[in-house]
Amino acid sequence: MTMPLLQPPRKNPVKRTPQMNVPPAARGRVALNLTAAAAAGRFELQQCLDCSAVQYPPREACVHCLSSRLKWREQSGAGQLLARTTLHHSNDLFFRERLPWQLGLVQMDCGPALVVHLHGDVAAQAAGPQARQAPQARVQVGARLDRAGRAVLIAFPAEETPHMADDTMLREMSCDPRLRKVLVTDGMTPVGQALVRALIQAGADLIWVGHAEPWKRHGSGLDDITALPQVSLVPLDLSNERSVTALAGAIGGKVDIVINNAEVHRTFGIQARRGTDAAKAEMEINYFGYLRLAQAFGPALMGRAADGTLHACAWVNLLSIYALANFPPHGTFSASKAAAHSLAQCQRAELRGAGIRVLNVFPGPIDDDWNQNLPPPKISADALAGAVVKALRDGAEDLYPGEVAQEWLERWRDNPKVLELELAAGA
């Protein structure tokens, strides 16, 4: 059984901070489809459209009928553990620093046999006395992103076990906020306050909550979350580089997860309002504010990516499903989020070398004041915050919470041009 994670002793400031060595990242183009699915929290394998055989490892032609018509499809993950072994030596620096490492061979119910990483509880069950009576333990295989941002396969126990998320190997594949220190950039909004509550429920050790306009605290709900023992209020104005730099100098070396939820949202297109003041305000926070924050806190996260059990691990961007295709009634807001999405892809590429996960969140309309005139369904702040915490635990890179976001994503994947035409027509 996995032992619960405990708060480690305070770090000796004189000791050298280890540098991150990421696992091997080389993958072929076909195999990257496995990573693309894992980034969204799905376990997919290739399936032949002619003979229905499920394939692994990824390939160009079916191993049974040689057909090239292979489609990536989500799999249940159920299977049987056939064999296990323990890796005690590796020339790869990532694994060398984390030995011993459990590996296994799993026969999937859908067909292929997979070499997988073993969750500690599976390995213990396979090595224990009960293994003689049940040598082929039932397992649940899932895809996770490793510290290099590439998909790996992990065999989990068929049924949930106590403290399952605290497994040493699994924590290398996730960004669980439990016992970690988190910065939430805007605590004045319902989403920011919901994030704080969700993080506390998930076991976060300390949460810094940013506020740009302290004179607006009354009636904003900020006093309620400030009263929580895990919360520390900090001044943070993303439109002011001096404010961002000062906060990074004060807490940058302690933050494990940054959640950038600060945004300006106005409901204008191009012709609805003369001038550029509203669009500038949106870009100033949604894009340039994000850029200032990334420049100030990014190097600190990278420097602590291998700093013990509770190392720096993740950056979360609250974007919008409007970043994929412009929603004309909120046209300038959509444009600012599209710019932020592009910047987030650059940030992900830069932080990947240090093993820092960048989670981009693309919610549909949030149930707040600026979406008042949009009809349901709209996602609540609490539902959005819960989805973000779950995505951190699962180690995902892309999250589309809410019914509208899921629908738009499917339409965008099917045909981006058709979605553009539908949105222009108000559909």
Language model features with spans:
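Conserved glycine-rich cofactor-binding loop
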Residues: 188-189
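A short, exposed helix-loop element centered on a Lys and neighboring polar residues
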Residues: 294-295, 345
